[in-house]
UniProtKB/Swiss-Prot annotation:
This is Acetylornithine aminotransferase. It is found in: Cytoplasm. Its cofactor is pyridoxal 5'-phosphate. One of its GO terms (molecular function) is identical protein binding. The gene is argD. N(2)-acetyl-L-ornithine binds at residues 144, 284.
Amino acid sequence: MSTAADSPLSLAHYYLPVYRPRQVVLERGQGSRVWDDAGREYLDLSSGIAVSGLGHNDPDLVAALTEQAGKLWHTSNVFFSAPPLKLAEELVSASRFAHKVFLCNSGTEANEAAIKLVRKWASSQGRPADKRVIVTFRGSFHGRTLASVTATAQPKYQEGYEPLPGGFRYVDFNDVAALEAAMAGGDVAAVMVEPIQGEGGVMPAAPGFLSRVRALCDQHDALLVLDEIQCGMGRTGTLFAHWQEQVTPDIVTLAKALGGGFPIGAMLAGPKVAQTMQFGAHGTTFGGNPLAAAVARVALRKLASPQIADNVVRQSAALRAGLEALNAEFGLFAQIRGRGLMLGAVLAPEHAGQAGAILDLAAKHGLLLLQAGPDVLRFVPALNLTDAELADGLARLRLATAEYVAQP
């Protein structure tokens, strides 16, 4: 008979305690379902924080990984291999704006590369260090490394890591007047923005906001950097979220769904900056390894397909309708916001701060969700989510919601 000491959870004390994972050990997955080591099934509407865009155990990704694993895993960037070269070409072609690509291992690394590229470009223009400011937006999230967490305009992620790097300025999201004022001094080299803030509460850019940011960047000869790490790769119904605003960026950062669950990141550079970094200006040991690139090529091809785009639009409407029906019954939400399959259900004031409690009850009923702060339930399921999976997820959410509202 197994005991608690036999569970992998007994080893959790070896982890640096920077996470608060649920006391569940997930063992396998298929589509939008996962099973724990006790055999219990869960419907997964979190997709590893918007990473598993094709669900779990996608056969095409497994085949690509298995085939490449039998050939070559790693060379470092002192040699060429075919998968990253082909991936770079395919990303440039798919992007509609980029000329060059830098491949790395994560979203944070992609954003670090973007920050360095901005600074290098400003330097190449003869701008002194005090005129290389990067503007970001309150509520943003750009990563955990020191420069990217400084770009992340949320004090809770920065506390205790001072002194932070200089040269960043924060303004309120969707506030054009505030951005105009922040750029008026002529010291801004770039504006870095998420088309939809993820960790900031699933908050979309207001209609026309990205176009105004682009215009201000043009006016002040500043770069536009779009962080599409969470909202990109088909999640909003188009391969890139900014396509829906018809703006052309100078730099785009990607990760998460690009690898379908295998770690990879990418920075895409447009013509204005594509030649800025030359030999030795930046680098990575593992970035663009043939194993990750082989998987990402297949993920990109599938995520860019019309079938995925159509499914995202259809399931987004169905998920919204399901959440609205729940709200009509239980009065839990003040607002449903977001685009595509990146939706946030904002809790009504009387339920403020209870997102975590609702997630606990959802897990009890076999549903895996995320929160985006204490007041928002975040839905970022696989983009190939089926009708049956969504219906099952909504049914489980209804059970969790009913139990929540019945509590004294």
